[in-house]
């Protein structure tokens, strides 16, 4: 009896060991559990920060009523004004346009992207600076957005906030002060995500159209944002069976509806997730970023993303829903770098 019990304990111990190995298999740095220490808590759409990422924006130059985005940004500091350098990244060309937004203490502001950058789809990075355009530690910015797409997808998404890990922010001067490098290394700014997850993918056969939006975060914004490159992913059904997939893209924002064509799996998606069933996926870029000029190495690429679901039966079925959310962050990159131009705020 004792021998049988001991054998059972050994089997359980082996299973826990294997489970721990599987959990640590994702590339990148594990997200920390202790969020009580400043600099440990990572990017989130439920907090304030010195950098905000709005994961998608769009607008139609012809019919802004049908396709548009409203950006909302708030300065939660009750004493100090905020200078915010906005960077609008074209998801297809990776070209960058910019503007300054200045907020007084406790002020909030909203604008339509059809007024500032009509006809472009991409993402926005907002950086807190001083009046001279130099990045500073100012963990009081928060934001959200309302987005509607001509396909019928819509969502209210919180802006991802990245706070600084220290009040003494070390801003690396580039090109003799013409530009500044933002280091997301857990020492200056908090780290950015590497492995992303979509925790629920409903069946297409039930009227669901799930759109995926992926953003490469990094690059020299005086030249252009970095491109995504190659991906690898794992797709699970609700019975824990798994298949892998891969794909490549030459843009800095990738947008596609989950279907039998994307991601290409064997068997196809509709077989893996049939009517009445669901699944989930995690994915990550397989390339590297050369961060050696900033004290790094060939580091993992940083990624953020959004998932938007549209169900054509929403008004006729109790189990049909539409909306969107930011993707879950599974692991982090050791270092990500954004280089921004530096010049005085124009407001």
Kindly give the residue locations of the regions a language model identified.
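Generic low-polarity alpha-helical segments
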Residues: 1, 18-19, 212, 281
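Bacterial N-terminal signal peptides
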Residues: 10-20
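Gly/Pro-rich, tryptophan- and cysteine-flecked surface segments typical
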Residues: 24-347
């Amino acid at each position: 009896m004792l021998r049988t019990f001991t054998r059972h304990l050994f089997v359980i111990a082996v299973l826990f060991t294997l489970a721990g190995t599987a959990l640590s298999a994702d590339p990148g740095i594990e997200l920390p559990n202790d969020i009580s220490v400043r600099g440990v808590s990572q990017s989130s759409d439920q907090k304030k920060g010195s950098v905000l990422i709005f994961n998608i924006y769009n607008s139609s130059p012809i019919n802004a009523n049908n396709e548009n985005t409203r950006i909302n940004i708030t300065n939660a500091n009750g004493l100090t004004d905020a200078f915010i350098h906005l960077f609008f990244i074209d998801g297809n060309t990776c070209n960058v346009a910019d503007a300054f937004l200045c907020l007084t203490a406790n002020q909030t502001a909203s604008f339509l992207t059809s007024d500032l950058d009509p006809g472009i789809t991409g993402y926005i990075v907002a950086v807190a600076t001083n009046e001279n355009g130099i990045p500073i530690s100012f963990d009081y910015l928060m934001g959200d957005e309302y987005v509607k797409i001509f396909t019928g997808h819509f969502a209210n998404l919180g802006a991802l906030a990245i706070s600084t890990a220290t009040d003494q922010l070390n801003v690396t001067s580039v090109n003799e002060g013409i530009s500044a490098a933002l280091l997301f290394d857990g020492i200056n700014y908090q780290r950015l995500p590497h492995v992303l997850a979509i925790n629920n993918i409903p069946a297409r056969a039930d009227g669901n159209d799930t759109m995926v939006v992926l953003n490469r975060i990094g690059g020299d914004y005086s030249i252009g944002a970095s491109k995504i490159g190659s991906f690898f992913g794992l797709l699970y059904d609700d019975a824990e069976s798994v298949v892998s997939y891969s794909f490549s893209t030459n843009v800095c924002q990738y947008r596609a509806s989950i279907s039998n064509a994307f991601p290409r799996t064997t068997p196809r998606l509709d077989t893996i997730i049939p009517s009445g069933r669901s699944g989930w996926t995690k994915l990550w870029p397989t390339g590297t970023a050369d961060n050696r000029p900033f004290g790094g190495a060939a580091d993992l690429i940083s990624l953020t993303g959004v998932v938007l679901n549209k169900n054509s039966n929403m008004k006729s079925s109790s189990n049909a829903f539409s909306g969107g959310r930011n993707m879950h962050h599974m692991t982090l990159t050791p270092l990500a770098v954004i280089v921004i131009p530096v010049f005085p705020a124009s407001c």
